[in-house]
Amino acid sequence: MKEYYLSENNTLPLVISGDNDDSKSKDVLVKWIEENKSQLEQKLTKHGAILFRGFDINTPQDFEAIAKAFDNDLKNDYLGTSPRDKKTDFVFSASELPPHYPIMQHCEMSFLPSAPRRLFFYCHIEPEYGGETPVCDFRKVYNDLDPKIRTEFEQKGVKHIRNYSSPDNKSKNAF
């Protein structure tokens, strides 16, 4: 397997791809993940995200096998706000919202008492245009906050209030 970054000055995410056509199958990737789990855990902690790119993952079932190889204690109790479609026991669509409806930067289910430790994303059908999964290292966002603000968050906590307009509301003034 080879490792690289999408750009020289950004180490999020760490990209891992197969060295050759023989190393790009789902079964090879599952075995490699199982054999290298502790190193992958360290890399995930260091970089914040790992992108497995160019592997032969063709179905939600294939993707679930990859996720289970990395974490055999997956959860499937989705409590988010975006409409989702269940594909397998542990794989859901990212959103059933129309493509013109943006999904803003967020910390997935951070409003829960115990937010997910890990998230796995998979692109089954690549969009003809656009399409994105923006990622952000919120550890850096936290470190960039003014220390006084961080202290307030730590002492007082955070209250989440979500105000969403419906997907069919095209008004830019809807809050």
Feature locations, PLM:
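Non-heme Fe(II) oxygenase catalytic core, chiefly the N-lobe of the double-stranded beta-helix
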Residues: M1-F175
